[in-house]
């Protein structure tokens, strides 16, 4: 747990990067590879921006290929001298001219406007609560490049079309020409669907209709209510009620994925998602399903690549059963507790955990100021292990002992099923 947190902190502090195809004294590289932090299954890299006085500032960038909109924090917009205008709900500014990733300039001018979340003054540096990033790199920018996300190696590569050598099984995909969003031809139970490829999402989603159909057809499939672990995306009010299920097998383009954890996509969000995709879709596959792969995006040829990088699957749902909301001030509010076998998985009540409490620390490690990925690393481990949660309620702090549970148990493999028969 501490090793994971320390590794992320090291990445943020050192900002090491290396460029390809650019020996000293020569022109700007045509492709670069830089270290990436995989935090709550999201890809975060270091980049530099030039401020008005000519100096440069290092910023953390969220690689967000499932979103066409450019977003940044108000602090960054102000630092760059951009004019910010606000409504009652959000702010915006002209897009920055460019960012520099590992020595390679990535122009952002193709996106006319950058969205800025409406935050209090003391949260001006917050792009999204629970993340340490101040700007994203959206699909509308990425679509002009070759892109490679190496999850096992914690690396990110970007280059001009034709400069990255992709490996692994490949398949043709549909790309929205207006915004770069990707739909991958897929099959579930021999029926064809489109599923988006969204490496900016920590968890995967299925349409309400398809989710219900699979749940009815497979009543013994592992399922639960409550967005714990990687399903705890942003701490939305409805996350304690989200339905989760493991799907036995998904053919995703050229590869087959087993025991895929998926969330039921609320109907209103699904309608917006499908409209933005510009074509029929049954949901999306997030990074949680692809952490063992090096995922290559060849936008110029409408092709994706999946090279296996490791075989071990990390138990992303062996966690303390809390549903959390990261706040703009760095604190974490408890939205709810997931049940296990019909009982609360964390002690409830006056001496336990209640909705609205704040998670102060886990085993003495402060939660405030951490990312979602760091906090869930604290809350994860081996089922049965005990964690000491420091809880705050009404200005009073007290400890609650909670055990790590094995949520959403994986389906048995085919050999086990045959033995049972």
Put a short name on every predicted segment.
Residues 6-15:
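Bacterial N-terminal signal peptides
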Residues 19-421:
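Pepsin/retropepsin-fold aspartyl endopeptidases
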Residues 1-4:
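Positively charged n-region of N-terminal signal peptides that target proteins for export
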């Amino acid at each position: 747990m501490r090793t994971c947190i320390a590794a992320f902190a090291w990445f943020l502090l050192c900002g090491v990067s290396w460029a390809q195809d650019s020996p000293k004294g020569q022109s700007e590289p045509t492709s670069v590879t830089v270290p990436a932090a995989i935090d709550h299954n999201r890809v975060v890299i270091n980049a530099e921006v030039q401020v008005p006085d000519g100096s440069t500032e290092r910023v953390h960038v969220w690689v967000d290929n499932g979103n066409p909109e450019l977003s940044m924090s108000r602090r960054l917009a102000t630092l760059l001298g951009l004019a910010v205008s606000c409504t009652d709900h959000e702010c915006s500014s002209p897009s920055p001219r460019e960012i520099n990733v590992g020595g390679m300039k990535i122009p952002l001018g193709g996106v006319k406007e950058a969205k800025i979340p409406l935050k209090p003054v003391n949260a001006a540096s917050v792009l999204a609560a629970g993340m340490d990033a101040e700007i994203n790199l959206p699909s509308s920018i990425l679509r002009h490049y070759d892109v490679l996300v190496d999850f096992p190696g914690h690396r990110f590569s970007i280059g001009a079309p034709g400069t990255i050598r992709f490996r692994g099984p490949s398949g043709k995909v549909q790309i929205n020409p207006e915004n770069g969003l990707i739909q991958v031809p897929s099959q579930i139970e021999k029926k064809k669907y489109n599923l988006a490829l969204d490496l900016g999402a920590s968890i995967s989603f299925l349409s309400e209709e398809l989710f219900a159909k699979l749940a009815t057809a497979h009543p013994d499939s592992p399922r639960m209510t409550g967005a714990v672990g990687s399903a705890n995306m942003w701490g939305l009010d409805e996350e304690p009620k989200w339905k989760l299920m493991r799907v036995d097998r998904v053919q995703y383009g050229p590869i087959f994925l087993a025991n895929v954890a998926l969330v039921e996509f609320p109907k209103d969000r699904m309608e917006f998602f499908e409209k933005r995709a510009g074509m029929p879709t049954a949901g999306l596959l997030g990074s949680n399903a692809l952490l063992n792969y090096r995922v290559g995006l060849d936008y110029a040829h409408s092709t994706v690549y999946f090279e296996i990088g490791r075989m071990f699957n990390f138990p992303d749902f062996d966690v303390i059963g809390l549903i959390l909301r990261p706040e703009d001030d760095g604190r974490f509010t408890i939205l709810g507790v997931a049940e296990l076998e019909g009982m609360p998985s964390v002690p409830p009540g006056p001496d336990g955990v209640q909705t609205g409490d704040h998670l102060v620390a886990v085993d003495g490690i402060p939660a405030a100021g951490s990312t979602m990925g760091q906090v869930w690393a604290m809350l994860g481990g081996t089922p049965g292990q005990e964690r000491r949660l420091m809880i705050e309620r009404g200005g009073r702090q007290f400890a609650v002992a909670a055990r790590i549970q094995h949520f959403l148990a994986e389906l048995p493999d085919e050999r086990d099923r045959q033995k049972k028969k």
